[in-house]
């Protein structure tokens, strides 16, 4: 659907490796069952570091994952919430690691439609989504409302959610993001 995606600008805060030891001392890592991109990114990182821990697919619950493994990968709201609740267990931000290594943004997802989808409707949807996102960025009262709702839903402070939306993720793909996507 063109220029729409989920892009980290370095530190992403929502794709995190947790554990009570650094990654190079993890014998096994629990992977969530809800993200192929993040699992692939962690495998890339481990390969870059010459690490080969055993990787196990488990449900995305930090406590149960860490009862069974030295490390646990969490994404999305669960990662944001767990980082707030257990800051000492955060060992690695994968968005930051990708950008540090490649110098490029990390694209965690793109908005796509099946080839059989009506092209006119897809153009209309893309136009509307881009306009809404740009309005969110420009209109402070609208952003504050979204931030308040998201913070309440996830259980974080509005300041933390505002930082996440403005500094850590973007929903627009630019040339650099597309290059990062191609590299990945």
Report residues per predicted region.
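Phosphate-rich cofactor/ligand-interacting catalytic cores and adjacent structured alpha/beta frameworks
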Residues: 5-8, 69
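Short, basic, helix/turn surface patches
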Residues: 7-16, 83-87
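Small-molecule pocket liners
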Residues: 11-17, 106-111
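Bilobed "Venus flytrap"/periplasmic-binding protein-like clamshell domains
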Residues: 12-70, 75-78, 179-182
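An extracytoplasmic/periplasmic, membrane-proximal ligand-sensing/linker region
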Residues: 79, 146-184
């Amino acid at each position: 659907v063109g220029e729409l995606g989920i892009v980290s600008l370095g530190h992403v805060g929502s794709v995190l490796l947790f554990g009570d030891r650094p990654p190079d001392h993890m014998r096994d890592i629990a992977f969530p069952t809800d993200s192929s991109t993040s699992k692939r990114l962690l495998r890339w990182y481990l390969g870059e570091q010459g690490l080969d821990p055993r990787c196990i697919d488990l449900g995305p619950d930090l406590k149960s994952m860490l009862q069974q493994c030295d490390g646990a990968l969490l994404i999305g709201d669960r990662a944001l919430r767990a980082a707030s609740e257990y800051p000492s267990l955060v060992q690695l931000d994968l968005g930051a690691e990708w950008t540090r290594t490649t110098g490029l943004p990390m694209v965690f997802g793109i908005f796509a439609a099946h080839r059989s989808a009506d092209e006119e409707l897809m153009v209309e949807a893309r136009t509307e989504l881009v306009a809404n996102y740009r309005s969110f960025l420009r209109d402070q009262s609208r952003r504050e409302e979204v931030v308040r709702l998201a913070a309440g839903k996830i259980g974080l402070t509005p300041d933390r959610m505002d930082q996440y939306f403005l500094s850590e993720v973007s929903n627009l793909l630019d040339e650099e993001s597309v290059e990062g996507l191609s590299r990945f």
